[in-house]
Amino acid sequence: GNTVQAELQKAATRLFCTACGITGCSRTDSGVHALEYAAVLEEHGTSVIPEEAVPRAMNTYLPQDISVFRSETVPDDFSIRRHVVGKEYLYLIWNGEHRNPFYTDRALFYPRELDMEKISAALPHFLGTHDFRAFMASGSEIAETTRTITDIRAEREGDFVRMFVSADGFLYNMVRIIVGTLLEVSEGRLSAADLPSVIAGGKRESAGRTAPPEGLYLHRVFLRR
């Protein structure tokens, strides 16, 4: 399928009538959503479009499921990846008895009971700076696996459960594996007390399953100003 980057590139090329480069703030897996995403557009022509008009102009060329809502001019040597100091992900769970057709591919349908007390007891173990190797998809070739989680929380509102994780950076599938692990804590397959040794052990098989992509949203991007 088409990527968001490819669609942005196509729209920018049509808008500015010249080939444009797009660099995103991070990679997202297929099936994952973004409520906020930052990207740098390199426009090589001599644009006469004022920056505040770019979002509306871009949106006329973008498909219905992508929307630009803000733009600003940055220096030529601006590197988006170097300016990202953190990100927050949201994982959305529909915990109703029956599936919600409005949230097909937009939330994980989980009809079993979710034990919010058990989940809440598990959350503090993830906070702080740890080697999160156990929460990285096997086969990833990343040497440095230490990350700092600055905030992690779970909230219920009716049949929706929202899990938020903020960190200075994330490993491949890290949030989805954390969510899968929290589901297994709720199910009683793991306990909150197991988590320090799971984290310290660094073995992927000790952590929980990888939750499906459809519930995951890149929620906020924190940029150094």
Write out the residue ranges for each language-model feature:
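Structured-RNA-binding interfaces characteristic of tRNA pseudouridine synthases
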Residues: 1-225
